[in-house]
């Protein structure tokens, strides 16, 4: 049977993979956004696991809020990336960093 520890280990592995993805690839903005989304999904998995283990629905409510914020963040982030790519013809973090005033 799959217990709480299995879900927590899986959530920790997903979180660690996303942290490694952020630290190893700091050039491409799309990969950074995907790593942040993976991090949020790992947190959601832990919330769901604890919610099921404790028989409390508060964790599931938090997951809905996190998914809503993550969807809005993805939509806004991708819209900004499309505008930057149209203007600069690149999505490299170093080139976008040169936009500072």
UniProtKB/Swiss-Prot annotation:
Entry-linked Gene3D superfamilies: 1.10.287.3510
Entries under InterPro entries matching the protein: NADH_UbQ_OxRdtase_chain4L/K (IPR001133), NUOK/Mnh_C1-like (IPR039428)
The keyword Aminoacyl-tRNA synthetase belongs to this UniProt entry's keyword annotation: no
Membrane-topology descriptor: Multi-pass membrane protein
Transmembrane region(s): 4-24, 30-50, 61-81
Pfam families for the chain: Oxidored_q2
A GO term for molecular function: NADH:ubiquinone reductase (non-electrogenic) activity
Quaternary structure, from the entry: NDH-1 is composed of 14 different subunits. Subunits NuoA, H, J, K, L, M, N constitute the membrane sector of the complex.
Family (UniProt): Belongs to the complex I subunit 4L family.
Stated name of the protein: NADH-quinone oxidoreductase subunit K
Organism: Methylovorus glucosotrophus (strain SIP3-4)
């Amino acid at each position: 049977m799959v217990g709480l520890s299995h879900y927590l280990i899986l959530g920790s592995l997903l979180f660690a993979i996303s942290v490694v993805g952020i630290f190893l690839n700091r050039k491409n903005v799309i990969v950074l956004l995907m790593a942040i989304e993976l991090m949020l999904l790992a947190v959601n998995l832990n919330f769901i696991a604890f919610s099921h283990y404790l028989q409390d629905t508060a964790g599931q409510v938090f997951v809905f809020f996190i998914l809503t914020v993550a969807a809005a963040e993805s939509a806004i982030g991708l819209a900004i990336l499309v505008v930057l790519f149209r203007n600069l013809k690149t999505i490299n973090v170093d080139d976008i960093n040169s936009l500072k005033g």
